[in-house]
């Protein structure tokens, strides 16, 4: 029988535990973890994500600040704002919401963030730490998926994990985290030939390509664990994943829904990494 992974319930449980840790930090060190989220422009999806992050941060007892900037801001002005938060000891996490307007180079912006405050885990220094097995800040979605797999007692050792999507945000860091758990990893992408033949070999299938209902039951072997990272809208405006949930759930042993699966865990790991950054600031 298929079990649905309840990412929302798990996230709530972990955030409650995190709130207790924050309270202990206040009592022991007189310190409150600080997170600033910088939003450029008025992308509706980004606005929703940012509101959810701020709401969760405040609920967990964090100092939370959201900076909303015009999409006409220059690259230099944005970097200057980031530099200010790099120097501010009351903020331990800095997140610049992507995507950015076309005239701003997102690589330059990521480089401008202090790696010790880069709670998205996108700075090249943190990427290097991840691939050398000494990770400090890890991209939040892969980190959240690993937490989910652990909570649902998915043993990864020796298992074949297939990832659809090779982005720097999900696919590539996901591969490294799975390798660290001794899984055998196949990273597929838009140029992979005979994709469904590859994915049917997967004990664990992670899908992050941004195409609604792309993965159907023919991509999945019986009893596989299926993690859907996709967030898409169908023609009626309904939120759907990259996986055709109704069809694939008939074959999977474990599957994440959309919404209520990976998304809440991404925010949870963002908060956890901000907390850890704050903790390092008083224990270094």
UniProtKB/Swiss-Prot annotation:
Family matches, as Gene3D superfamilies: Leucine Dehydrogenase, chain A, domain 1, NAD(P)-binding Rossmann-like Domain
Domain of life, source organism: Bacteria
GO biological process: L-histidine biosynthetic process; methionine biosynthetic process; purine nucleotide biosynthetic process; tetrahydrofolate interconversion
EC number: 1.5.1.5, 3.5.4.9
GO CC field: cytosol
Enzymatic reactions: (6R)-5,10-methylene-5,6,7,8-tetrahydrofolate + NADP(+) = (6R)-5,10-methenyltetrahydrofolate + NADPH; (6R)-5,10-methenyltetrahydrofolate + H2O = (6R)-10-formyltetrahydrofolate + H(+)
UniProt keyword Amino-acid biosynthesis present: yes
Keyword set, alphabetical order: Amino-acid biosynthesis, Histidine biosynthesis, Hydrolase, Methionine biosynthesis, Multifunctional enzyme, NADP, One-carbon metabolism, Oxidoreductase, Purine biosynthesis
Recorded GO MF terms: methenyltetrahydrofolate cyclohydrolase activity; methylenetetrahydrofolate dehydrogenase (NADP+) activity
Pathway membership, UniProt: One-carbon metabolism; tetrahydrofolate interconversion
Alphabetized InterPro entries for the sequence: Aminoacid_DH-like_N_sf, NAD(P)-bd_dom_sf, THF_DH/CycHdrlase, THF_DH/CycHdrlase_cat_dom, THF_DH/CycHdrlase_CS, THF_DH/CycHdrlase_NAD-bd_dom
Binding sites annotated in the UniProt record for NADP(+): 165-167, 190
PANTHER family documented for this protein: C-1-TETRAHYDROFOLATE SYNTHASE, CYTOPLASMIC (PTHR48099:SF5), C-1-TETRAHYDROFOLATE SYNTHASE, CYTOPLASMIC-RELATED (PTHR48099)
Family: Belongs to the tetrahydrofolate dehydrogenase/cyclohydrolase family.
Quaternary structure (record): Homodimer.
Function (record text): Catalyzes the oxidation of 5,10-methylenetetrahydrofolate to 5,10-methenyltetrahydrofolate and then the hydrolysis of 5,10-methenyltetrahydrofolate to 10-formyltetrahydrofolate.
Full protein name: Bifunctional protein FolD
UniProt organism field: Streptococcus mutans serotype c (strain ATCC 700610 / UA159)
């Amino acid at each position: 029988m298929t079990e649905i992974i309840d990412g929302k319930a798990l996230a709530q449980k972990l955030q409650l535990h995190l709130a207790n840790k924050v309270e202990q930090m206040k009592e022991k060190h007189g310190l409150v973890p600080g997170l600033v989220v910088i939003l450029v422009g008025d992308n509706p999806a980004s606005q929703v994500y940012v509101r959810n992050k701020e709401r969760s941060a405040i609920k967990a007892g964090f100092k939370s600040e959201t900076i909303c900037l015009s999409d006409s801001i220059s690259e230099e002005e944005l970097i200057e704002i980031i530099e200010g938060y790099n120097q501010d000891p009351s903020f331990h996490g800095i997140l610049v919401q992507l995507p950015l307007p076309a005239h701003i180079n997102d690589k330059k912006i990521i480089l401008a963030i202090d790696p010790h405050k880069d709670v998205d885990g996108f700075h090249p220094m943190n990427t290097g730490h991840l691939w050398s097995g000494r990770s400090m800040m890890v991209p939040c979605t892969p980190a959240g998926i690993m937490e989910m797999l652990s909570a649902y007692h998915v043993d990864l050792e020796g298992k074949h994990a297939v990832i659809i999507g090779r982005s720097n945000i999900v696919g590539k860091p996901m591969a490294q985290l799975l390798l660290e758990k001794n899984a055998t990893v196949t990273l597929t992408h838009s140029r992979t030939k005979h994709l469904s033949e590859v994915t049917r070999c997967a004990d664990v299938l992670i899908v992050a390509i941004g195409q609604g209902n792309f993965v159907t039951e023919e991509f999945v072997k019986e009893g596989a664990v299926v993690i859907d990272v996709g967030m898409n809208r169908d023609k009626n405006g309904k939120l759907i994943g990259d996986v055709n949930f109704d069809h694939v759930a008939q074959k999977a042993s474990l599957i994440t829904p959309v919404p209520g699966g990976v998304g809440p865990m991404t925010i949870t790991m963002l908060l956890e990494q901000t907390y850890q950054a704050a903790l390092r600031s008083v224990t270094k």
